[in-house]
Curated annotation (Swiss-Prot):
It comes from the Eukaryota. Belongs to the SAPS family. It comes from Saccharomyces cerevisiae (strain ATCC 204508 / S288c). This is SIT4-associating protein SAP185. There is a cross-link at K20 (Glycyl lysine isopeptide (Lys-Gly) (interchain with G-Cter in ubiquitin)).
Amino acid sequence: MSGSFWKFGQDFGSQSPLAKLLNRAFIKIDDKPTSTEAGKIDSNSTDESLESNSFKSEDEEEEYELPNREEDYKAYKPNLSLLNDLLDDEELYTELMCSNFKLLVYLKYPEVLSKLIDYVRNSTILESNIDRVTSEDRDLVRGEDKDTTEDFENAKADKKNIDGTFEEKERTRSGEEEELENEENDSASEDTRVTLPHELEEHDDTRRARIAAEILSADVWPISSALIENEGLLAKLWSILRLPSPLSIEASTYFMKINERLLDMNMDGIIEFILKKEHIVDDFLAHIDNPPLMDFLLKVISTDKPEISNGVIQLFKKQNLVPKLIHLLDPVFDSCTQSAAGDFLKALVTISGNCPNEITSSIGPNELTRQLVSPNMMKQLMDIMLKGGNSLNNGVGIIIELIRKNNSDYDTIQTNYTTIESHPPTDRDPIYLGYLVKMFSEHMADFNKILTEKKIPLLQTSYGTIEPLGFERFKICELIAELLHCSNMTLLNEPSAYDIVRERDAERERIFNSQNYVDSNDRSELKENEDDNTGDADDEVEDDTNQVESANTSIDGEEVIDKLNSLQIETNKVNQNMNNEEQHSLMPDFNNGDFKDEEDENPFEPQYSDVILDSSDIEKNFRVSPNVGDQLKISLQDTRVIDTMLEMFFHFQWNNFLHNVVYDVVQQIFNGPLKIGYNRFLLDDLLINIRLTDMIINGNNECIEYEKGHDTRLGYMGHLTLIAEEVTKFTAYIEEMNITFENTEVMSSLFESKWIAYTEDVLEDLKEKYNAILGDIAEEGDMLQDEEEDAVYDKGERTMGTVDDYINDIMQMDNVRCQEEEEDEGEGYVSFDEDEPQEYRNGDSVRSKESNSSEGKRDQEQLYYEYVNEDGTKTRLNFNPDSDATEQVPGEVNRDHKIPLKLKRSFTDACKSETIPNNTVNAKEESVFQFSNELSDGWESSPSNSIPKRASPSKNGMNSPMFQHQFELHSPTDEFGGHKDEILSAEGHDYDIDEYDELSDDSDEEYDNCEDEDSLDYADSAAYALCRSKSKDKISWDEEEQARLMGVVKFNSEHYRD
């Protein structure tokens, strides 16, 4: 591959600089050359080649020709002194991706891979700034380059000396040409080397480190496989994590690229190596603010899938990954470290959600997130958040992500419907958020204190001096809104759910501890057995040794069983103690109250009456032993947090983020359950104590006064209107469902006269403005009226009609313009089928040969259309039939058919190929359609002359229009609508059938009167079919339609004549 793209001035047959380097990159183990003589040619072999009168180059190739099989390279070792030259060659990576055999073999040597890792771990790369290279490092780099350059120059000098000797002996012209060729190759080799100015020489190791990282992370199986199989090389690479922080972004990026490649190629091998590291968590957390390293750590965690667990999550749990991350949120650390720890925890929660199909890397609930929501971790996180500052912001983000990604309503198996026997607890059980909600319920007063007492200096803006809300207060409001969402989850409102989850957690912990105990005993027994086997190796009696080992094994097994039983007994005791402590706590557990025996007054039972029981006695029963969801709602009411948030809503008039959060809280309360849970009492408090309706009215009045002085509305008015609409929707709901409250003050607040006046006047006007269409409606309406009045058609000016008539006229005018454009484009493209048995007749057209003078006189007075079927029968359509005329053409049947209004819906597909049924109509029967003057909706059509022709399906070589339609005749005596005669092929019309369906005024009557409903679905948007149904309507065609059809006949007679 090295000769595929050669340099200018070089022969294609000459070797590339990289190929020359690779020829000298291997040293035979038997030769043992020194570092300075690695590239030299043996003088004895040169003398022999001179005596044999052969070319030097051929002798070198024969003597130093490298093997073609990889197994033969075991007798060679790499020439490490050429590695710098290889890395400086610009074609190295290209040749590597092209699978250069010699290059792959050279790079697979452990010595070469170790050297490449040294380049990645170079001190210059590990430092965060390249300019901080010490003089010693600079001298070291220059010294290595100097040694490599001297070796290369010595090799070239020896080569030139040999060439000179050869020239003196031979004096041939071929020798001189060979010398020139070698000199050109040497100069080309020097030119292709990547050289830098003198002041940038210290960047050579940076460039080589980048190339080394690209080689180690390349998609080349031999290199990756050789790296994974050598655990010493992996340990050397991972030693980067042991270096002090901060680690440069270049070094961490190289580390991530290389290990991601190895992880994708051989996941089991890398995971096995990771599981052996005892301090991997500490190594990564030492560089917590290094994004590439933390991203790689998250990817390692995502490899532990629910269906195939590899033990990574258990390893990180043992090494306390989550507690250490929470500790890093403390304000004692700098803000960058806090933010990095918070971001990693949020990313961990994201991939651990209970909806595994949301993202590709999702691993579902696991022990790490379960440890995160445990009571101890929540208590630690709560204490850190109450310190305020950046810790509060990061903590709120973690809590919100936990709630959003672990909604118990989406769990596949609901925990409250399971038992330990039916569903034994596993490490992949859903995450229970009850501990989290319970902890925040107990500390809600502390968060409310931050809301009310936090003071921030005033801020000068273009609108004047304002008081900023502050990020802490906004985050607390956002947290409260999310906790209210969480408290409405079904599992958190089940009285027995808390006890069930605690029991499952205790059982899960017991199983986990027992497994660890058994594993530790197995490992200790294995070591003891190994020691026993070593100590008894010199024993002469083997049978006695086996008996002793079997006895020891049985004794150890009994001890393990006894210890497991004792562990289970201790666990049960611990559970009992925990239950007893919970029963005597300030917030008692569920199902522990006197109201259990009073089934008639159980507030947790859903109410099926129309009266909402919200009396003070019911509220007291709820407070005796509330469930987790109700605990949060009670804390919200007791701390008056919602009242504080509403006051902030009107105080911070321009903070739309706060307005959106407050609206979310109010919306949840009004849309929450009324007959179960404590939500009804929050609603009562919102309407009675807080007086939400009065706050809305006062806020609107304040906005009106502000608008008079500043000519602009206050910033909260948009969300205030939304809150008012929630109140009106709730009022409409209770009226529709005939719901009343036991507390009469609720209904009184909803039906106060001032609130009714506000909703009927102010709120309706606001809603009308919000729903108005943008633009000048009056001007647009006048323009539409003028266009409707000026609409003119073929027969003169039409009188004012309905809106549907106007839209129909506009559609027809557009279709006329489209058809005229098609005529201009398709001029000269139309041909006519000469063999088609059709004749188009008009008052001025040519008569058929069978017509006589009497028929000619009648044709001048009467317009009709006549054609001949394949079976020899004739069919005539009279456009203006004379009601008194009784004369008939011999052999024809002349009947007056009434065309129903259903004609608009009877369209056929113009793009379908024409098929003429055989013997579907009586050969002696001919139908003549008579059009009357009663149809009000005329068609505007213009025949198109741009219809492409195709051969008829029935006659090969016959030209006929490609786009056709048929006027379908339905026999009046056909009860089933199955006899049709497709009689006419004409040009297509570009009408939208869906639009005609929408404009139809009597679609229901048409469907009812239609004999065959399938005919309505047979239509398509490209053509029409005149249909006859059993409809008894008296509507007939008017003069406008007659004139239009006359135009069609005249056009066809002029363009499709023989």
